[in-house]
């Protein structure tokens, strides 16, 4: 099993390195954050806001978008068929898709607060749990998109909508109460709310909401992937 996972992770890394567009999209949130901080946040008053928006961009562009593109590329280049014939299961394939996006999110979780000088010591546990569960949710969502996309071009088109929604929903919610309610019940709502309030304890309600998202999207993802396997 570990040999298969190592081979799958190596394949993911090779796809990432060879795809300049994907690599640029992955790095874009960090570049945008640096530019915004240098030109719009000279007094440090927007540190918390920039952290919230930058993390949602890392989620959507870094951890989410890359998954659907990689999945679609596997199908387009018939890598998925080769993996099936080599004995890789849907569960192993899904797990291999979690690793790189999670590492990218962990990098953002650690480096962005340090760069923006945001002290998370009072609510670090809630911050980590909310973000990890949100990351798993968006990975599952993009796996679904990749599973129903026959080509990378289709995956790019289908992925752009959730990417834009996740990236800009918190900003639009500041001006619209209806959008704010949608945000509250989304998988990014708990950590956006945590940063907006400047702290807080781990909420059982928010935890239940995030676990529900993970469960629903995870089951849907495995169902679609297993059907994809049967169809090959």
Predicted regions and their residues:
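Transmembrane helix segments
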Residues: 35-42, 148-188
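Short alpha-helical transmembrane interface motifs in multi-pass membrane proteins
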Residues: 52, 60-65, 95-96, 122-130, ...
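Alpha-helical transmembrane segments and their short interhelical loops
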Residues: 90, 98-150
């Amino acid at each position: 099993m570990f040999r298969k996972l190592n081979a799958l992770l190596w394949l993911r890394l090779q796809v990432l390195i060879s795809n300049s567009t994907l690599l640029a999209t992955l790095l874009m949130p960090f570049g945008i954050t640096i530019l915004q901080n240098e030109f719009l946040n000279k007094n440090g008053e927007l540190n918390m806001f920039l952290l919230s928006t930058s993390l949602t961009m890392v989620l959507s562009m870094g951890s989410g978008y890359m998954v659907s593109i990689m999945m679609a590329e596997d199908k387009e280049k018939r890598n998925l068929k080769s993996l099936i014939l080599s004995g890789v299961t849907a569960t192993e394939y899904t797990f291999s898709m979690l690793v790189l996006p999670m590492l990218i999110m962990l990098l953002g979780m650690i480096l962005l607060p340090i760069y923006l000088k945001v002290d998370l010591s009072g609510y670090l546990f809630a911050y980590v749990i909310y973000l990890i569960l949100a990351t798993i949710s968006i990975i599952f969502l993009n796996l679904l998109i990749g599973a129903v996309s026959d080509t990378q071009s289709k995956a790019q088109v289908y992925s752009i909508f959730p990417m834009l929604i996740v990236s800009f929903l918190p900003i639009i919610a500041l001006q619209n109460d209806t959008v704010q309610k949608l945000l509250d019940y989304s998988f990014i709502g708990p950590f956006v709310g945590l940063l907006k309030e400047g702290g807080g304890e781990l909420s059982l309600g928010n935890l239940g909401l995030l676990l529900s998202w993970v469960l629903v999207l995870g089951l849907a993802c495995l169902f679609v992937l297993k059907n994809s396997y049967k169809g090959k």
